[in-house]
């Protein structure tokens, strides 16, 4: 391990990440770093000179951390990176702000177009990276630009076009830490916005296992198809490997039944991919990110 950069925030060595993920599985971070503020993060990156490998971490909602943990430094942005501000008819939102919190803020301030965020777990930063979407809307529809630091500490901005949004992804460089997202503002009726959000919440609670240890949608929907239908057709509803299972309620969700390992979940996902391909000839692609070392 190289000498760690001098910081104002805090380091934690051999830090268990399991409790930070929705699946509640996975190994430790070799070094866990929460920057104090923007200047602290920038200083760390400049001092590091890309010597230590860096992994960024959001709310842990759409990720499997493998049981062997993560080498290098895991960076998690905290409360100093979750602010919501108005400026010139735009919203400027910190990347660690939860999607749900932004949806609630917009409802309270009669801003329309953000209703779908109430049903998307995770942070704004993760939502941008995934081009997260639901109910006919996605991040690409509301983003103006993003602000970021690269792993060398250079400050960069990217417009909506430069981000290169695509279905559940983008064309941004991989060595970025997103800091803020700028959104366009369209005024609406607060009560109508609330009704839309309540409808989304009701739909989610009746069709998705939101009270279970899950990580959201497991696979990207193939063009013109639904992953859950393909999984169900392959006879895998409720299928188990170790402590992991396919949800009985929604086949595109995996569940930790209480004692699953990251390996159980990843093995289950790969088994599903194999069986769906054998049954339908369709190759499912992971939506859930898998990172870290195998044991």
UniProtKB/Swiss-Prot annotation:
GO cellular component, one term: cytosol
UniProt domain FAD-binding PCMH-type: residue ranges: 24-188
MF terms in GO: FAD binding; UDP-N-acetylmuramate dehydrogenase activity
Enzyme kind, highest EC tier: oxidoreductase
Protein name (database record): UDP-N-acetylenolpyruvoylglucosamine reductase
Pfam families listed in its UniProt record: FAD_binding_4 (PF01565), MurB_C (PF02873)
Taxonomic placement: Bacteria, Pseudomonadati, Pseudomonadota, Alphaproteobacteria, Rickettsiales
Pathway this chain belongs to: Cell wall biogenesis; peptidoglycan biosynthesis
One of the protein's GO biological processes: regulation of cell shape
Gene name of this polypeptide: murB
Superkingdom per UniProt: Bacteria
Keywords: Cell cycle, Cell division, Cell shape, Cell wall biogenesis/degradation, Cytoplasm, FAD, Flavoprotein, NADP, Oxidoreductase, Peptidoglycan synthesis
EC number: 1.3.1.98
HAMAP family per UniProt: MurB
Task of the protein: Cell wall formation.
